[in-house]
Amino acid sequence: MVDNINNSDLNRDPITGEPGSHPIGTAVGGMGGAAAGAAIGAIGGPLGMLIGGAIGAIAGGAAGHAAGEAIDPTIEDTYWNDTYSQTTYYKDGYDYTTDYQPAYAVGYANRAKYPAGTTFDSVESDLERSWHEVKGNSRLAWEDAKEAIRDGWDRTDARIAGQEYSPRLRTVDGYAEG
């Protein structure tokens, strides 16, 4: 499944209609990560704090806007909710909201915290720690969650680089890389 950004993904400014409106990303970048993480975390708990901290970790309004372009939690959540059950690592009977949503969020939210070129493998222990902090009621053990976290990380990494991304999807006769 190739990710094509369409008109609905342009985050139009509600006043001007211009694409690329990320008032949260821009404001968060300007205010700083700590305040943003705390504010969003108060609403969304540990998972909200993770996402808010990732967006706020990049200092400055312009950098915050760039982070907002790469990580739009609404777009990521919709994408993964539509895709998770088609992946090679999907476990029958596990649902998106409880089991997989926190895993994808660990991947995409944490990617923004590291410099370009940082690999998943080089920060895997940090990601595992983050998983245990935000997993909530997810039934996924680290080894199972790791694949979804990697997909969230890799998709965000590709979006930052302006590249297309395809997760590992099931095929009719087995499994194949996406």
What kind of region is each of these model predictions?
Residues 1-178:
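Intrinsically disordered, low-complexity, hydrophilic segments
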